[in-house]
Amino acid sequence: MIQKSFVMMKPDAVQRRLMGKILSRFEEKGLQIVAVKLMQIDEDLAKTHYGEHADKPFFGSLIEYITSSPSLAMVIEGEEAISTIRKLVGATNPLEADLGTIRGDFAMDTGRNIIHASDSPDSAEREINLFFNEDEICDYEIVDNKLIYE
């Protein structure tokens, strides 16, 4: 099933100039970037996005971190995109993430774990709608899809 997922490279990925390397992992897998924007996330958007963590002790530092520098927000589409992206991203704790995953290769600390990816279709829809307007999401076909998908 073709799905859309929300993915965000966090400030540490941007500051460490890892955006190109990370983006290429999704494209090389056969996923399609259908929306992307570099943005400075303000406190209100950060609190809305991470609202499920509002009662956790790390919430304040998470908001401070995510608003500290630009992030790269994306919508990525593909067959079973949500689970595929989660596998590419790796475990939330980079020290538990397998080598070869984005977090396993580029991150060392849970508080600076490089990237966010939607964990369910409901989360993906909510997060996409939070960060993108409908007219910012492109609908196009990649010519090599017939080489990737049967």
UniProtKB/Swiss-Prot annotation:
A GO molecular-function descriptor: ATP binding
Functional summary from the UniProt entry: Major role in the synthesis of nucleoside triphosphates other than ATP. The ATP gamma phosphate is transferred to the NDP beta phosphate via a ping-pong mechanism, using a phosphorylated active-site intermediate.
GO cellular component annotations of the record: cytoplasm
Gene3D superfamilies per UniProt: Nucleoside diphosphate kinase-like domain
Source organism of this protein record: Methanobrevibacter smithii (strain ATCC 35061 / DSM 861 / OCM 144 / PS)
Active site: 116
CDD domains linked to this entry: NDPk_I (cd04413)
Location within or outside the cell: Cytoplasm
Family: Belongs to the NDK family.
Keyword ATP-binding: yes
Keywords: ATP-binding, Cytoplasm, Kinase, Magnesium, Metal-binding, Nucleotide metabolism, Nucleotide-binding, Phosphoprotein, Transferase
Name of the molecule in the record: Nucleoside diphosphate kinase
Residues reported in the UniProt entry to bind ATP: 10, 58, 86, 92, 103, 113
Top EC class of this enzyme: transferase
GO biological process per UniProt: CTP biosynthetic process; GTP biosynthetic process; UTP biosynthetic process
Its EC number(s): 2.7.4.6
